[in-house]
Structure formats: C-alpha cells, structure tokens
Amino acid sequence: MPLNLRHRHFLRLMDFTPTEIQFLLDLSANLKKAKYTGTEQPRLKGKNIALIFEKTSTRTRCSFEVAAYDQGANVTYIGPSGSQIGHKESMKDTARVLGRMYDGIQYRGYGQELVEILAQYSGVPVWNGLTDDFHPTQILADFLTMLEHGEGKRLNQMKMAYLGDARNNMGNSFVEGAALMGMDLRLVAPKAYWPEQKLLDEVAEMAKKTGAKITCTENVEEGVKGVDFLYTDIWVSMGEPEEAWEQRINLMKPYQVNKALLEKTGNPKVKFMHCLPAFHDENTTVGKEMAQKYGMNGLEVTDEVFESDASIVFDEAENRMHTIKAVMVATLGQ
C-alpha cells in the first residue's frame, strides 16, 4: 500500500492527516468495488478480532462482523452484559488480557478516555466504534457517500449543513473531518448545542491549512443556503430523563429537516443524510409515542424527506461496512 497505516489505532479523525483520510476513502471505494465484482482478496486471514460493545448497535456491529468475515477474520462479540469491564476489571487490565488473545479490538461505549486506555495498553490496533465524544467510522462512511453523490466534486468543494444537536459525537467528528478535508461545514443549531469552543480551537490551524470553513449559526436560512448535503441525527438518546426530551424537542423544532427546509437550500439536487436510527414515522414504539405526545410529523426529519429521492441514508448505512473494512485492512491487513 502506498501509505503504511499498519498497527495504527483509529480513535479520532484528528490523529490522521488529510492524505491518510483520503487514502482510507480510496481504499474503501476499491474494497467496495471488489466486493461487488467478486474479486475481493482476504487480507485478514487468521486474524482474531474482539468487538466490545458497552452500548448496543445495529449498523456498527453488523459492519465490523461482515467486514471481518469478508476479509477472512474471526470475531468475538462482547456485549453490554458479556464482560467485567469497569465492574470487576479495569479497562487497563482488560486491554492487557485481550491484547494477548486478539489481533485487533473494536470498542463502542462511553468515555473517549476508555478507548484511549484500551489503545495504550492492549498492544494491538484499536478502533473507535463510537464514544460519547467521537464517532470517526461514521464520518468515513459519510464522506464516501458524499463523494459517490457529489457529482464529481471533491470534499473540499462541498458544502454541508449539520442540523440539530451539534455538540454530540457526530457534531464533534464532523468538525474534525471538515477541518481535515477542507470542507464548508455549517453547524445549524441552538447556541447551547454548538460544539465546545475548545474543539473548534483545536482544529483551527488544520482548517486554515486546508481552507475549511466551519460556521456555527442559529439561523436556519443562512445555514442551509446553497448546501450540497443536509445532515441530522436524533435529538434525544435513550436513557435520558423524559423531562429532558420535552425541553430538547421544543428547542430543536425549528431545525427539523422537512420539505420546506430542503427548499430553503435553493439547491434542487440537495441530498439528505442521517446516521440512523431516525425517528421519521410512527412505525417504532418510540416514534409512535413521540408523535402522540408532541403532535409532530417525525422528529428530526419528516417521513416525506426520509423516503424522498433526496435521501441517501441507506447508501450511507451500507458504506459503514466498506469504510470499516478499509480501516481494519489498512491497520491490520497482510
């Protein structure tokens, strides 16, 4: 491979250079093509991979498992109730045990410091499948999807608006990704939900080098004008008190992605993205409860937009697997 990322961890995007991120995206596209054409070569044969999930998941777990199987690796799934991490055994000790048995470890859980401890003490590549602070594998999938639907534009020629809760792990990772790849990113959210200033300061130098433009605004019209992509995420997380839901939903209502908001972009070819799961209809227990309680047509996005031709959310979901495969092959492959 032209770049050597072997034995590197994948904990957050700012640990990499723009060239390295582009390399991972190019590798993802090549691996995707190989899978579709039946020409994929297994480069993880004989490797054993541990998947630690302290938070449940559909896309991340399936992506890591299918990617590993495609490449000839074996996986062990360690679910939220399947380990002693933090209860009877520290992450430091867990890292030193698993590092003796496995060639690579994925972690999806809470504090960023936990995945960093795992990386520090395991002695094998560690991949961040999501923490409270960052979700780097999702951003890789998003960037690949944007390149596929960007009509030939490079990332540094693209404009994207991220609406809703921009202080979460997705907002944080988009800030890092946009800075690295020279993008025009608008974080369109209530001021209380803008990213921490500390993070914006951290990426400022990189953004200057790449020509990235990162803007925080409460003004929906200004934020979405002329963008190529509209992106949102769920407004509330399971486990938060119900009072927090009501307050958050009322605050976020102006940032819902609906048909009127798409029209405000002035771009008839604008695309809609979402990392999923999405509360767009009443076909889930939570979605039905939210619709009845708040009288809304969807929460962060309406069903009309979610099911429209503008929506590329399922291309995006598929690309989780191809980009995760690229990360594992680049850092662990033979």
Curated annotation (Swiss-Prot):
It catalyses: carbamoyl phosphate + L-ornithine = L-citrulline + phosphate + H(+). GO terms for biological process: arginine biosynthetic process via ornithine; citrulline biosynthetic process; L-arginine biosynthetic process. One of its GO terms (cellular component) is cytoplasm. InterPro entries: Asp/Orn_carbamoyltranf_P-bd (IPR006132), Asp/Orn_carbamoylTrfase (IPR006130), Asp/Orn_carbamoylTrfase_sf (IPR036901), Asp_carbamoyltransf_Asp/Orn-bd (IPR006131), Orn/put_carbamltrans (IPR002292), OTCase_ArgI (IPR024904). PANTHER family: ORNITHINE CARBAMOYLTRANSFERASE (PTHR45753:SF2), ORNITHINE CARBAMOYLTRANSFERASE, MITOCHONDRIAL (PTHR45753). NCBIfam families: orni_carb_tr, PRK04284.1, PRK12562.1. Reversibly catalyzes the transfer of the carbamoyl group from carbamoyl phosphate (CP) to the N(epsilon) atom of ornithine (ORN) to produce L-citrulline. This is Ornithine carbamoyltransferase. It comes from Pasteurella multocida (strain Pm70).
